[in-house]
Amino acid sequence: MSADAPEQVPGQFTLVLHTHLPWLAHHGRWPVGEEWLYQSWSAAYLPLMRVLRTLAAEGRRGVLTLGMTPVVTAQLDDPYCLDGMHRWLANWQLRALEAATLHTPTGAEPGTASTPEALRQFGIREYDEAGRALEEFGTLWRHGASPLLRELIDAGTVELLGGPLAHPFQPLLNPRLREFALREGLADAGQPLA
């Protein structure tokens, strides 16, 4: 190779993250209700956005393609869900505080995960993580996911991928319903984010 020739890339790698949950707001708490949304939000969406915002701040571009169904995006922007998530995070921190201050013997064998000391250590870690999530949510997420996604898209860090309106198993749908789900989902993805 000459000194002027660009270095060849030995291969390419594409990272595509796809996310989907059904509409969970106002459908109860547990086991398949809002608790599922809030757990996913705290364990997946908050850390993912944290990492992507860090990469965007470093000037990283073309990091990944993110598939967000309209149902998920709508819930992450919905005022009812935003309030519910804030309450869920506060309750997470309270549950962690209870575990962190546990002094009652549990009857567990020494050295197991359910001893008071193990539960205290778990509670301390969870309390710290819940506090971080609460602070981050309060400062970054109070207006939903769309402003955060818009920031990442504008920075060129993330490419947003459209898809079906919901997430049915496409081959089993009536062709008219399949066409509707894809057409409306892509139209939704074409709408400008905050």
Language-model segments: residues:
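Carbohydrate-active enzymes and regulators
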Residues: 1-194
